[in-house]
């Protein structure tokens, strides 16, 4: 879902070719096609592929697979306020834009007012019959209409930023999307998230096979 205020601004009205490039690059990361020849590669092929939707929720074919352009009333938006659902009436209006989360991963692309945030995502709900530590467990999607935009948001300010074989950029949108989709699928950060800003090496990602680390020392 591309939110735009000015169709002449490429950072708002992102062209379909760029969006396809980003999804393809994200798939390459998840399928270990980028780092497979690196000397210290410990990545794995996740046997997973993200597909651009070919049909809208009503069953009609999409003119541009996986892409919906939505005219917005402001050129940028606070991603936290858009995502958190605390303003219930506003959240319900935003939620009308998402497609059935049981069938689609909803990704919203728009310029963030906070330019230091590259992307943001909700963690998923796990079914009560298959609970997972670290996630909200319950049949939320089966019992409720979604009352807020449960989605991934990507800051389109950096939509054309990506690393190449010569130069690395920390604003790489390929990595940002792959990272946020990891959260959407249930992954926490591997570094310590103890909530006290003490930067202790606590294992807080609920995965014993990923060693924790002190992000302050690492960076």
Model segments located where?
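Structural recognition of the beta-strand scaffold that forms the well-ordered cores
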Residues: 1-2, 49-52, 104-109, 150-156, ...
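The catalytic-center signature of Zn2+-dependent metalloproteases
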Residues: 157-219
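Propeptide-to-catalytic entry region of secreted or membrane-anchored zinc metalloproteases
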Residues: 1-103, 110-113
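Active-site scaffold of zinc-dependent metalloenzymes
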Residues: 116-169
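A short, structural micro-pattern
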Residues: 44, 101, 146-148, 201
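Intrinsically disordered, low-complexity coil segments
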Residues: 63-68, 72-77, 85-86, 118, ...
């Amino acid at each position: 879902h591309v939110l735009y205020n000015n169709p002449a601004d490429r950072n708002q009205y992102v062209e379909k070719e760029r969006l396809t490039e980003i999804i393809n690059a994200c798939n390459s990361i998840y399928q270990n096609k980028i780092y497979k020849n690196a000397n210290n590669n410990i990545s794995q092929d996740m046997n997973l592929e993200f597909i651009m939707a070919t049909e809208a929720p009503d069953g009609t074919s999409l003119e541009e697979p996986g892409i919906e352009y939505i005219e917005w009333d402001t050129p940028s938006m606070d991603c936290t306020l858009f995502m958190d659902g605390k303003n219930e009436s506003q959240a319900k209006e935003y939620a009308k834009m998402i497609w059935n989360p049981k069938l689609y991963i909803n990704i919203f692309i728009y310029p963030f007012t906070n330019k230091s945030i590259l992307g943001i995502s909700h963690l998923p709900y796990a079914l009560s019959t298959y609970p997972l530590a670290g996630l909200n467990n319950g049949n939320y999607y089966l019992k409720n209409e979604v009352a807020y935009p449960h989605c991934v948001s990507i800051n389109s300010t950096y939509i054309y930023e990506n690393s190449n074989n010569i130069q690395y950029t920390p604003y790489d949108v390929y990595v940002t999307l792959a990272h946020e989709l990891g959260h959407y699928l249930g992954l926490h950060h591997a570094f310590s998230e103890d909530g006290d800003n003490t930067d202790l090496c606590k294992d807080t990602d609920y995965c014993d096979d990923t060693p924790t680390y002190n992000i302050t020392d690492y960076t």
